Amino acid sequence: MRFQEKLHQYSKEEIWEEYCGFLTLSSAEFMNIQNRLLLEQMELWSSSGLGQSILKGKQPRTISEFREMVPLTTYEDYAPTLLAKQVGSLPGDPVLWVQTTWEGGVHPIKVAPYTKAMLDTFKHNVMSCLILSTSQKKGEFDVNVTDHMLYALAPMPFVTGLLPLLFKDEIDIEFLPSVRDAVKMTFKERNVQ
């Protein structure tokens, strides 16, 4: 169900709980969730070619073992695999790749794969941010299908270019200028008119 349908079918309190309920978690509850998510990611990463290139055959089973076995890494450690977009070495199949500049790096850009699961989580988080950005207090927010938003974003393949795509899946908020027009304009052109 799209977010805009939830606006008509659920109370603001129910929507708040779904998207912003994490704000009321205790520290222990929050850490339990984070540890579970870290274990899930650790298992996926450890069994991938990319993970094994760092682990050198080791298989950590706990977060403590992972911390002991895995050295601190930087993007430089992953660059050969990611820049070549070696999908077979990744923990999951990417749906798309985003990029950013690489200040101080050997190459001019960094690229990062996004899987369907990552995009779904990102979309949920974007909607949470939209709710929080329009709220005055817990359970109250001001999001409507008729809202307009300034397109002051770098377009795809930069990660900010995902925002209009993710919004489109959830709510018919209009961007000004329209996404179709904005992606053809320079940053200056988008923000001067």
Regions found by a protein language model. Give the residues of each.
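Nucleotide 5′-phosphate-binding alpha/beta core
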Residues: 1-193
